[in-house]
A protein has these predicted regions:
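Short, solvent-exposed, charged loop/turn and helix-capping segments
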Residues: 83-103
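Amphipathic, well-ordered alpha-helical segments in soluble domains
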Residues: 50-53, 57, 79, 83-86, ...
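Immediate post-signal-peptide N-terminus of mature secreted/exported proteins
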Residues: 24-76, 148-149
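C-terminal amphipathic alpha-helix
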Residues: 37-48, 59-60, 112-149
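Short, charged, amphipathic alpha-helical segments
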Residues: 73-78, 99-107, 126-137
């Protein structure tokens, strides 16, 4: 009987712990959705056109936050993130210092929009609004860099 006990304990432990092994996969942060992006965009070829897309999505996000529309805010933020991730491919041919400034500002802006996203998911509308104002400041900085080109 003693030889079966370790095997029985190991099997019991494996069965008890196996749900924990996948607990972190596609988790929803208690917001009712997972944070894997399901939004697909086609990034414009030119950086100036990409900037116009960013501005349009920012306006959609602002309107969604004002209306307290979580699904619209989520979708706009996801599209903003996708456009921001497309920037490095558009800046690859630029001078190193210019590329570094634009790409760095895009990363900072992505973090700011992520703050808006999480605040709106939590229905913390004051925080979402203040995070959106930070993002607007980042948009102005990025616009200034792009306008120099």
């Amino acid at each position: 009987m003693k030889t079966k006990t370790p095997a029985l304990l190991a099997t019991t432990a494996l069965l008890a712990l196996s749900p924990l092994a996948s607990a972190g996969e596609n988790h929803d942060h208690d917001h009712g959705h997972d944070h894997g992006s399901k939004i697909e965009i086609v990034a414009p070829e030119k950086l100036s056109d990409l900037w116009k897309s960013l501005e349009a999505e920012h306006d959609k996000l602002s309107a969604a936050i004002e209306k307290k529309d979580i699904p619209a805010a989520h979708d706009a933020e996801q599209r903003l993130q996708a456009y921001l991730k497309a920037i490095p491919a558009k800046t690859a041919a630029l001078e190193d210092s210019t590329r570094a400034r634009i790409d760095g500002q895009a990363k900072n802006l992505a973090r700011a929009y992520d703050g808006v996203h999480h605040a709106s998911d939590d229905k913390a509308w004051d925080k979402a609004t203040s995070s959106l104002k930070k993002a607007e400041g980042g948009m102005k900085l990025l616009a200034a860099q792009i306008e120099k080109l």
